[in-house]
C-alpha cells in the first residue's frame, strides 16, 4: 500500500483541488483509495468531492478511539474512492504515533491500495503529526518567486524531519517562465526546491488539467508515463 502526503509551501497553490483531482484519477485508474483530510476545520474535500452530507465521525474521532474505521468513512460517487473527512475543531493536531498505528492497521488489510493525505501548508505540529504517513511527500508550488521560496523552505523542513521521497508538482504553469522569476529554467527551480519533478499542471482548460492529474496519479503508482508538455523553454 502506498502512503502519500500532498501539501504546499504556502496557501493559494490549489493544493486541495489538486489532491481531490489526483484521488479521483487514482480511483478511475482502478485503485482503491482512501483520501484523508488532515486540515482542521475546513472539510474542503466534502465540497470538492460533492459529498452533500457530513458524516457523524471524522479523522480526529478515529485517531482518538471514539469510533471504528467503518463508522468514520464517507463513500463518494466515484467507485473505489472513500473519504475520511477532516476534523471540525480548528485547533486539532494529530499525534504521530496514532497516525503510524492507523497506517499500519490499514497496511495489514487489502481494503485500500493508496492512502492519500491532504495536509495544509505549513511546518508545525500538524505537519509533524503526519510524518509517519509521508512515504512520499508531494509538494505543490506555483511558478512565482514567493511560492518557490516557500516550497524550498517547506521541502527543507520535511527533509529535516526525516521525509525522504520528496516530489514537486508545478500548478498553473504557463507556456513561458515569468520574467521576474529569477531562474533561467525549471531545472534551476527544482534544484532550489530540492525535490524531483512529479508533474506539471497547466493553466486553463479542463481537459489538459485532467490529463495532467491523471499522469501524476499514474506516476505516483510507479507507472512510466511522460510529463504533460506544458512549458516551453
Ranges and model annotations:
Residues 114, 136-139, 167, 199:
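Well-ordered beta-strand positions
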Amino acid at each position: 500500500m502506498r502512503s502519500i502526503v500532498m501539501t504546499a509551501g504556502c496557501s493559494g497553490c490549489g493544493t486541495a483541488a489538486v489532491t481531490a483531482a489526483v484521488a479521483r484519477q487514482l480511483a478511475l485508474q482502478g485503485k482503491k483509495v482512501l483520501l484523508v483530510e488532515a486540515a482542521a476545520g475546513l472539510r474542503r474535500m466534502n465540497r470538492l468531492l460533492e459529498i452533500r452530507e457530513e458524516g457523524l465521525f471524522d479523522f480526529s474521532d478515529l485517531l482518538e478511539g471514539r469510533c471504528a474505521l467503518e463508522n468514520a468513512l464517507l463513500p463518494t460517487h466515484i467507485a473505489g474512492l472513500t473519504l475520511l473527512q477532516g476534523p471540525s475543531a480548528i485547533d486539532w493536531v494529530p499525534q504521530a504515533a496514532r497516525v503510524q498505528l492507523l497506517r499500519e492497521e490499514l497496511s495489514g488489510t487489502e481494503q485500500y491500495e493508496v492512502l492519500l493525505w491532504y495536509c495544509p501548508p505549513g511546518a508545525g505540529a500538524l505537519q509533524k503529526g503526519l510524518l509517519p504517513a509521508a512515504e512520499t511527500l508531494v509538494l505543490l508550488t506555483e511558478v512565482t518567486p514567493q511560492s518557490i521560496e516557500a516550497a524550498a523552505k517547506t521541502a527543507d523542513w520535511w527533509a529535516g524531519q526525516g521525509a525522504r521521497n520528496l516530489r514537486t508538482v508545478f500548478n498553473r504553469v504557463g507556456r513561458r517562465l515569468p520574467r521576474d522569476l529569477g531562474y533561467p529554467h525549471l531545472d534551476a527551480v527544482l534544484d532550489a526546491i530540492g525535490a524531483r519533478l512529479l508533474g506539471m499542471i497547466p493553466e486553463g482548460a479542463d481537459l489538459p488539467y485532467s490529463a495532467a492529474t491523471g499522469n501524476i496519479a499514474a506516476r505516483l503508482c510507479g507507472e512510466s508515463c511522460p510529463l504533460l508538455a506544458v512549458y516551453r523553454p
